[in-house]
Amino acid sequence: AAGVLSGCSASELDGLYRFGRQLGLAFQVVDDILDFTGSDQQLGKPAASDLASGYLTAPTFYAMEEHPGLQALIAREFAEPGDLDQALEMVRSSRAIPRTRELAETFARESRDAIAWMSDSPCKRALLELPDFVLSRLY
């Protein structure tokens, strides 16, 4: 909306849209990682609550590539005792978290690239700090 109100061209509006979309995707992917690596206190909800609720996120899909048995646990909705713990171990012992981190970094880079057309200014510098802030939640 700010781009429209400030008279940006169609291509500039597209760049601003791509910035916001890719930044939002980076944020969501970081949130997906934290669901497996964060504490209940950090998250404000139980860790692994997305998986327990049946939400399949990037780490889960990546882990299923390495651990096909994970799909069966998810399909039966963790009905057996220990299913959720076993699923968590499959995700944590795989390359799912590092691969998802790479995905978040890609989205963050794409958000920065989307506003490369902007001339240097305090506003642009502030926007360019946002992807780094999103990624900083991982460390």
Question: Model segments located where?
Answer:
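All-alpha prenyltransferase/terpene-synthase fold signal
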Residues: 1-139
